[in-house]
Amino acid sequence: MTHIAVIDNHGQFTHLEQRALRDLGVDVELVDNTTSPEQLIQTADGLVLSGGPDIDRVGNCPEYLELDIPILGICLGMQLLANELGGSVAAGDYGGYADVDIEILDDTDPLIGSLAPETRVWASHADEVKSVPEGFERTARSDVCRIEAMSNRDQERYGVQWHPEVAHTERGEEVFKNFIARCQ
């Protein structure tokens, strides 16, 4: 059975990420972000870097990026991917929370391509990715956030700025199904 570790970055929706994966039949574990990478790699087939309030409270998450397993960053998790791998993160022009219509820019993307041409999502963030790291491509955009999603297919690193685990996100379950497929 596929085992995915959800890394707890103290986000308000982290338990929903765990529940969404569990409901899809995955062996899922909620793991504190101070857990050693060596311990994670023993059982995890993939990692979800949860959202959270502050990039200064991500524990060992930067070290997890060295692991040779697929990683999905959600909200703060996506910002962490960008920040640690050479992209940039800054305050967004809009911030806050809202239903947002996003445009899928790459219908072949393994994480969100199946959502093309557009979908409605729940966003809740003040900061956002301003430039993607080398090797990544921008895979979604909206009127309120230029980089709504990004991916590096070669390294199996994916990020979404929105929250697929929240009921307000249409087709959020599909995002998790697509990530599970990358972990199998």
Curated annotation (Swiss-Prot):
Gene (name only): guaAA
Subunit structure: Heterodimer composed of a glutamine amidotransferase subunit (A) and a GMP-binding subunit (B).
Any single Pfam family the record assigns to this protein: GATase
Keywords attached to this entry: ATP-binding, Glutamine amidotransferase, GMP biosynthesis, Ligase, Nucleotide-binding, Purine biosynthesis
Catalytic activity line of the entry: XMP + L-glutamine + ATP + H2O = GMP + L-glutamate + AMP + diphosphate + 2 H(+)
InterPro entries hit by this protein: Class_I_gatase-like, GATASE, GMP_synth_GATase, GMP_synthase_A
Pathway noted in the entry: Purine metabolism; GMP biosynthesis; GMP from XMP (L-Gln route): step 1/1
CDD domains on file: GATase1_GMP_Synthase (cd01742)
Ranges where the Glutamine amidotransferase type-1 domain occurs: 3-184
Active site, UniProt feature: 75 (nucleophile), 163, 165
Gene Ontology MF, one: ATP binding
Physiological role: Catalyzes the synthesis of GMP from XMP.
Name listed for the protein in its UniProt record: GMP synthase [glutamine-hydrolyzing] subunit A
Gene Ontology annotations for the cellular component aspect, listed alphabetically: cytosol
Organism: Haloquadratum walsbyi (strain DSM 16790 / HBSQ001)
EC annotation from Swiss-Prot or TrEMBL: 6.3.5.2
SUPFAM superfamilies named in the record: Class I glutamine amidotransferase-like (SSF52317)
